[in-house]
Amino acid sequence: MEKTLWARVLNSDCGNRKSKIQNLKWVALFAIVVALTVCGARAEAQQSKVYRVGVIHQGGPYKAVVDGLRDGLRQLGLEEGKHLLLNVRDSKGEVKAVEAAAKDFERDRVNLIFAVTTSATTAVKNVTSEIPIVFSVGSDPVASGFVQSFAKPGGRLTGVQYSTTDLTGKRLEILKEMLPKLSRVVIIYNPKNRTAVEAAALARQAGKQFGLQLIERHATSVDELRQRFGALKAKEADAFFSISDAMVTSQAQLVIDMATSKKLPTMFSEQSLVTMGGLASYGQNFNEVGRLAAKYVQKIMTGAQPRDLRVEIVDKFELIINLKTAKQIGLTIPPNVLARADRVIR
């Protein structure tokens, strides 16, 4: 009888253990189902959320950056109106308009701001305090105070750098090769723009190296730019050389038209300006810059922090020459320079 009782006890313990194990399995299964349901709900909510992106550019060729941004977002599967809304502001080269737009965006609590050019990014950074900022700038973002380093931005800003200021000397060298008799070059820039002042210093340095006289004119507004260009006298300069200044570049069509009327060859940093009638450019494609920036917008939309997103550098440079413009101003481009061009507009 003792054996029978002991056997019953053992069987009871075994049954309890099996029951407990079975209960634990059900609990674990339930936890997995709940977790999957929550994750699915979060994913669905994230997909259904429409993100609002404030975009600020300074007009003219900088619109190509915004076009590239839209192209890049589409390539990433993000549709305007379905996944995000872009509120685009064109400041027409005026910093005050950039500041006003940035303040509007922060008041409206957009999810992030995309700023094009160094001066625009500086203005946006200065008048906002919390919104993540994705930039596309032509100068060193570390030296400009936007990020702590390229690898670890460390704040609320990150984005793409395209070399504009760094290529000042190279563009001047190419202009000299295109115009062997070149001796006087006019540059017009805003003396209140730190990036432009640095670019002017580099142009001066390169000018001495190539035996060129730089004629410097200052303009702090679009009206002043028009006045300075209009005041240029015949044969006062042999060519117009564009340096890194967002306000001047934003008025590229004005500059091109006035230069052409004075039969002045022009050298720019952005390719689209050559298709607009400029003589030549050496630098990056703004549309490509915008496409690269789209990756940062997408990553921040899905939870990444700007401080953790490495700044990307665009390092592909192309020489573009417009032979239609050369003919219009009575200029013959040396064959050796034409042979080096990545693209020739005929």
Residue spans of the language-model regions?
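Short hydrophobic alpha-helices and adjacent helix-cap/hinge residues
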Residues: 1-346
